[in-house]
């Protein structure tokens, strides 16, 4: 029996559910297991634990922002193929969200207290990008993923040598972020102008500075 198309109410409720899962810790079902080679939790000093927790909180916030961005773009995208691509990428990024939440819990820490704000701002940006054009929307994704990859690689370099667990998680995330970037470009993503790229980087830096502590 064929499934009936989703009504506007169904779509609204589904969107609300996705938003809540993005901002409420541990609300997503188990997805792929942690991409780690050992179940052993590395021993870190108090200072090291706090620093790694700050880095993972930034990365968790980045994944919350990715959820908001993809959901916003899917909400306003004009092309059905673009909508499906945004939704698929968002679903894959849920794994990253869960991995960061898990590592934060292992470190005895928590996500950013501003998580709902990060999501809301990103949803708005994504919705605007999706409304402008498909090429701009996909270009926005490509640039976002490129900048996310940069800070993931920077964080990997800042990890204590013995924290192989966090390193493997971030390395897997980085590989998949770059894949999402290539996918966006392959589907027609346009290069963004330098002022837009610089503004995105400035906003990301403000987010990282805040999320590291809060």
Curated annotation (Swiss-Prot):
EC number: 1.14.99.60
InterPro entries according to UniProt: COQ7_proteobact, Ferritin-like, Ferritin-like_SF, Ubq_synth_Coq7
SUPFAM superfamilies attached to this UniProt entry: Ferritin-like (SSF47240)
Alphabetical UniProt keywords: Cell membrane, Iron, Membrane, Metal-binding, Monooxygenase, Oxidoreductase, Ubiquinone biosynthesis
Binding site for Fe cation 1: 63, 93, 96, 177
GO biological process terms held by the UniProt record: ubiquinone biosynthetic process
Gene3D superfamilies from the UniProt entry: 1.20.1260.10
Lipid bilayer topology: Peripheral membrane protein
GO cellular component, one term: plasma membrane
Binding site for Fe cation 2: 93, 145, 177, 180
Entry's cofactor comment: Binds 2 iron ions per subunit.
Domain of life where this protein originates: Bacteria
Pathway where this protein functions: Cofactor biosynthesis; ubiquinone biosynthesis
Places the protein is found: Cell membrane
HAMAP family: COQ7 (MF_01658)
Family: Belongs to the COQ7 family.
Protein name stated in the entry: 3-demethoxyubiquinol 3-hydroxylase
């Amino acid at each position: 029996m064929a499934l009936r198309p989703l009504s506007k109410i169904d779509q609204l409720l589904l969107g609300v559910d996705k938003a809540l899962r993005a901002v409420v810790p541990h609300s997503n079902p188990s997805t792929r297991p942690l991409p780690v080679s050992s179940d052993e939790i590395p021993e870190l000093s108090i200072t090291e634990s706090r620093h790694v927790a700050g880095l993972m909180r930034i990365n968790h916030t980045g994944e919350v922002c990715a959820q908001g961005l993809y959901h916003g773009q899917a909400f306003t995208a004009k092309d059905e193929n673009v909508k499906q691509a945004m939704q698929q990428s968002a679903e894959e990024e849920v794994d990253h969200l869960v991995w960061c939440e898990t590592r934060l819990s292992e470190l005895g820490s928590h996500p950013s207290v501003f998580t709902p704000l990060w999501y809301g701002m990103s949803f708005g940006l994504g919705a605007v990008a999706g409304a402008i054009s498909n090429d701009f929307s996909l270009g926005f994704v490509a640039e976002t993923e490129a900048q996310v990859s940069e800070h993931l690689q920077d964080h990997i370099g800042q990890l204590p040598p013995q924290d192989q667990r966090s390193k493997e998680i971030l390395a897997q995330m980085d590989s998949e972020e770059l894949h999402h970037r290539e996918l966006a470009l392959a589907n027609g993503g346009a290069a963004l102008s330098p002022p837009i790229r610089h503004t995105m980087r400035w906003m990301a830096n403000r987010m990282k500075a805040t999320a590291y502590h809060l």
